[in-house]
Structures are given as structure tokens and as C-alpha cells.
Amino acid sequence: MSDPMRVRAQENGGVVDVKVLMKHDMETGLRKDPAGKTIPAHHITTVTATCKGKVVFEGQFGTAVSKDPFLNFKFKGGAKGDTVSITWVDNRNDKRTDEAKIS
């Protein structure tokens, strides 16, 4: 299991601003280790955010995204005290979900 994501969500004027720091190596499959062997690809492929059972953000990532990606997005319809859930899935079908209360 990977390290937890850092998720912050703040509501201001009816708009929720979500900031997410995802811990992931994001290996492209193109780099080589010191012995000259190719490091296998291991990267996030999809990120989904939900609030009150509705998808509020959905994105596709690939090899061009850096290690430990940061994501910032906004959506309408959330209120203080609601929970925002962020889930990523990588190319090895590893999955991580973390949540944060909207403040």
C-alpha cells in the first residue's frame, strides 16, 4: 500500500477548492537503474474525486506526470462538513483512496 495522500478542501462562496498531494513514484518505464536494467513502468492512470456520491472530478494521468503529483481543482455543490473522496488507480491496478472534510 502506498503512503496516504494529503487532501485539503475549502469552501468559499459556494465553490470548493481541493488540493491533493499524491505519493507515487510515477516511473515511466524508460529509465534505467545503476546496473543498466530498465525500471518497469509504474504510474497513476486515473484519478477520481467524489462528493456526496457524485463524481466531481475525473482525470487520466500518464508517464508525463512527475513523481508525487499535485492536483488542484474546484467544483460547485459541496458544503462545509461534506466529505471529498479522492481515488487513484495505477497501471499495476494498485489503488488508493483518501478523504477530507470540507472546511
Say what each PLM segment does.
Residues 22-39:
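Short amphipathic, basic-aromatic surface patches that mediate peripheral association
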Residues 64-72:
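Aromatic sugar-binding surface patches on proteins
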Residues 1-16:
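Short, compositionally biased P/S/T/A/G/V-rich stretches that sit at domain boundaries
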